[in-house]
Amino acid sequence: MHVQSKAPKDLHPQAQMTMLQRLYKLGDMFTVDTWPLMDQMYLVANPKLAHQVSQDSSPFPKHPMITRFLKPLTGYNSVLAANDAKWKELRSLFAPGFSNAHLMTMVPLMVEKTEVFCDLLSEYAAKHELFSMEPMAARLTIDIIGIVVLGVDFKSLTRRDELVEAFRHLLDLLPNGQTLDINPVTHYLRRKYANTMDNYIRRVLRDRAANGANKKFRTLMDIAIERYEQLPNGSLFDCGFEQLAVDNLKTFVFAGHDTSSTTLSNIYHLLSKHPEVLAKVIEEHDQVLGKDTAAIGQLIRDQPSIINKLPYTTAVIRETLRLYPASGSLRMAPKDTTFHPDKAPAVTVPKGSLIWVGIHTIHHDAEFFPCPDEFHPERFMTAKTITLADGRTEAVTAGWNGHAPPADAYRPFEKGPRMCIGSEMAMIEIRVVLAMTLRRFRFESAYAEYRRRHPDEVEAAGGRTEAFGDEAYQVFSSTAKPKSGVPMYVYTKE
């Protein structure tokens, strides 16, 4: 692929698709064939066409390839890959645990884990030690999701936990779609680590059954069990609730930690490069949260909803998610389907075809987001609600330099009924962590120093150190992660 001569060799496939579209001016929809590594796919690179795929009135189910990819980690019953009636029942079972009202009750626990994170940052500052932010942020977000979902404090920031270690090993062994998945040792290790996770969660479930729910707070598991017990006979969950719970609790540990940790890491990187944006964030925190940073944890504990009153911080998060979205949605054409691109002839996609909603490509299209590779949180300020032609409502913005994103162009958590179930939790969690760290610490992105120490990584990437003008370009590591985990120095502010 010619794009590989223009970009780092380890650039994430979704970012490669964006470069491919730019190089060859491929338009709103194009075909990509990497057989035998992956099925032939149709990449959607236009908001209107993406809406056609994600809308409720003409559902495009999740493609079976998702199950093939995630099965070693999430089993066969994950809400991420389920379709039709089974998906609806799973969604209704777990969605209440991700409601804003319930998540507000969990904010004090998020504060508690973030305080441990701050202690570790202080240690790195004292030692003036170079470290990679993403792995450390991932342990923070895994600890938070462990409490929210299971009621278990993994304490992985300060010790090794059996489930977390198995989980991290398993992530490294997931298929990558870029090499043939035929190594028997890899398959054995996947089963080994998956069994470790399954047995761990079963012990938690059985302990709850024997001793009752946690008296201090209700977890997502508690809410799901309560709802399951109210279901009538004939439920679709013929696999048995325990296995269903195991598969989906693993799913939430996987999906619930990743977006938050990568987004936090990318925000620290971007704010290090854009002090003018950081100054605006700090000004907002001073105004809304007060200037006594020593009291911030207790303030958020006492008033959890105050974390929702940070519009500029939220704009920074949204712009970061635009630049670095999670991998796009993989759907399957339920029948022969005709798409009508704006600037190309109609395309008929055969039944069963793989359709990839190219979120990265849409987010980096200058037609929808002028200067798409630049960081401008103002794109997402001054929100208002409009009613679309089909009756849906959507929050839109005044935009940056007068350019507001069109409807359906911004989709970091996807859109429609299959929108990420944990999107609200991710936004709350990220705001909590930023509120507790940005005024206490100064973060310095340190890619140049990291490359000096690790020239082998530069060589492996073909000697290229940037994509889209950015050192923290996305690479494939089970999901879309920032290059080298965002190497950083951190300093304690006086």
Curated annotation (Swiss-Prot):
Keywords associated with the record: Heme, Iron, Metal-binding, Monooxygenase, Oxidoreductase
* A GO molecular-function annotation: monooxygenase activity
- Which cofactors go with this protein? heme
Q: What is the deletion mutant like? A: Abolishes the production of acurin A.
Enzyme class name? oxidoreductase
Q: In which pathway does it act?
A: Secondary metabolite biosynthesis
Quote the Pfam families the UniProt record gives. p450 (PF00067)
- E.C. code: 1.-.-.-
**CDD domains for this protein:** CYP59-like
What triggers expression? Answer: Expression is positively regulated by the acurin A cluster-specific transcription regulator acrR.
Positions contributing to heme binding: C420
Q: In which family does this protein belong, per the annotation? A: Belongs to the cytochrome P450 family.
Role of this protein: Cytochrome P450 monooxygenase; part of the cluster that mediates the biosynthesis of acurin A, a highly reduced polyketide coupled to a serine via a peptide bond. The activities of the highly reducing polyketide synthase acrA and the nonribosomal peptide synthetase acrB are collectively responsible for the synthesis of the acurin A core structure with a heptaketide backbone produced by acrA covalently fused to a L-serine by acrB. After the formation of the PK-NRP hybrid product, it is detached from acrB by reductive release to set up the formation of the lactam ring by aldol condensation.
- Protein's name according to its UniProt entry: Cytochrome P450 monooxygenase acrF
Q: Which organism is it from?
A: Aspergillus aculeatus (strain ATCC 16872 / CBS 172.66 / WB 5094)
The beginning of the lineage is: Eukaryota, Fungi, Dikarya, Ascomycota, Pezizomycotina
Name the gene: acrF
